[in-house]
Amino acid sequence: MIETDKLFGAAPERRIVTPQRASEQEEALERALRPKLLDEYVGQKKAREQLEIFIEAAKKRGEALDHVLLFGPPGLGKTTLAHIVAREMGVNLRQTSGPVLERAGDLAALLTNLEPHDVLFIDEIHRLSPVVEEILYPALEDYQIDIMIGEGPAARSVKIDLPPFTLVGATTRAGMLTNPLRDRFGIVARLEFYNAEELTRIVSRSAGLLNVQLSDDGAFEVAKRSRGTPRIANRLLRRVRDYAEVKSDGVVTMAVADAALAMLDVDPAGLDVMDRKLLQAILEKFSGGPVGLDNVAAAIGESTDTIEDVIEPFLIQQGYLQRTPRGRMATAQAYLHFGLPVKDA
């Protein structure tokens, strides 16, 4: 049997390896560590090369960059790339998110204040309301918006011309975008999980910016437990630094990193409390699956959205979990991770 006391004792909101942003303070720290230019950006080779070419071409023609859609799991650098696009183009960036744009007027106010070639970044673009999305279509295609002035019989439509601009949309759920919206993006890039070597470079770079003394094997130890996600790698680095300063001589070696991450309940495979909790529920409560998502959510006390967007992608990518037409199933690798005999097919 798997020990469950520790697994079920940690609250999801305290999860250190979540790729979601935890606080305004952490977001400020992330901004300080972000690369500013494409040359500084590590990983995502395909997306980076595409953007390099399209940005250079747009600059040579003196045009706004075509609209860009960035999608993939959270924490992989979509916001960072949006800022880099604006900086490489030499223009301003205006940032908002889908849930914030509740009314058509909210979007119209942003669009009418853009300067030529500016970048408008909409995070969680899949959460735009249909009313706001309708306003966005002509803005993206013709650089125009139609807004209603007045109410009732006296209401009239006014067409407003916009300067050429670039929309950068980011989403963790590309499948939830409507076809008309998706089709208006000329550049579409999927961001993938990072490998350990790429994350080691990111951890080493961040350590330099934070003045952390870090050995090469210490950097790799942090990187390989970071779930393929730079945001998590930087968060773990800060916690390992704290541990090194209090429990050691301030130098993050492999041994120090291992001890610090063990204290944080991040195991050698990079799985944390919630990962193990989800896998344990499927293995023990549902005999390894298949089991429906709603049942898994009820068993571990998490929302289905959090499971699908935050917990599952890494487990699937690493081969611990399968999504099948009949439901979620633990793989042989999951059984072996917990020292359990593999279930016969």
From Swiss-Prot:
The keyword DNA repair applies. Residues 195-265 are annotated as: Small ATPAse domain (RuvB-S). Mg(2+) binds at residue 79. GO terms for cellular component: cytoplasm; Holliday junction resolvase complex. One of its GO terms (molecular function) is four-way junction helicase activity. SMART domains: AAA. Its EC number is 3.6.4.-. It is found in: Cytoplasm. Residues 4-194 are annotated as: Large ATPase domain (RuvB-L). SUPFAM superfamilies: P-loop containing nucleoside triphosphate hydrolases, Winged helix' DNA-binding domain. Keywords: ATP-binding, Cytoplasm, DNA damage, DNA recombination, DNA repair, DNA-binding, Hydrolase, Nucleotide-binding. DNA binds at residues 323, 328. InterPro entries: AAA+_ATPase, AAA_lid_4, DNA_helicase_Holl-junc_RuvB, P-loop_NTPase, RuvB-like_N, RuvB_C, WH-like_DNA-bd_sf, WH_DNA-bd_sf. GO terms for biological process: DNA recombination; DNA repair. Belongs to the RuvB family. The RuvA-RuvB-RuvC complex processes Holliday junction (HJ) DNA during genetic recombination and DNA repair, while the RuvA-RuvB complex plays an important role in the rescue of blocked DNA replication forks via replication fork reversal (RFR). RuvA specifically binds to HJ cruciform DNA, conferring on it an open structure. The RuvB hexamer acts as an ATP-dependent pump, pulling dsDNA into and through the RuvAB complex. RuvB forms 2 homohexamers on either side of HJ DNA bound by 1 or 2 RuvA tetramers; 4 subunits per hexamer contact DNA at a time. Homohexamer. Forms an RuvA(8)-RuvB(12)-Holliday junction (HJ) complex. HJ DNA is sandwiched between 2 RuvA tetramers; dsDNA enters through RuvA and exits via RuvB. An RuvB hexamer assembles on each DNA strand where it exits the tetramer. Each RuvB hexamer is contacted by two RuvA subunits (via domain III) on 2 adjacent RuvB subunits; this complex drives branch migration. In the full resolvosome a probable DNA-RuvA(4)-RuvB(12)-RuvC(2) complex forms which resolves the HJ. This is Holliday junction branch migration complex subunit RuvB.
